[in-house]
């Protein structure tokens, strides 16, 4: 077994692999789907809808951020809707389940959004 942390995500067209030798990591890739706006209220609260619901790109970012954070946190009983997004859609750091995660956003191909979340050691603030 690899001595580190691995996360995998894919869309019908692309696949992504994230590896970190020290810290839990999560990656999520999504391709825009017309059903996403109808699903958004199931995983986003009203404040998140106001910040991230303004465009397809932000809605995809919200979904991939929650999914990547969920994977990095590794808490089976955690529900994606309980992961609260930061007020700033471009934030490089967020807190979820009492832990701090660094965030990286990638747009490799038009229509795709990829978010990488890395669980930071306790006491670090994006270092």
What are these regions, as identified by a protein language model?
Residues 1-127:
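Core catalytic alpha/beta fold that binds nucleotide/phospho-ligands
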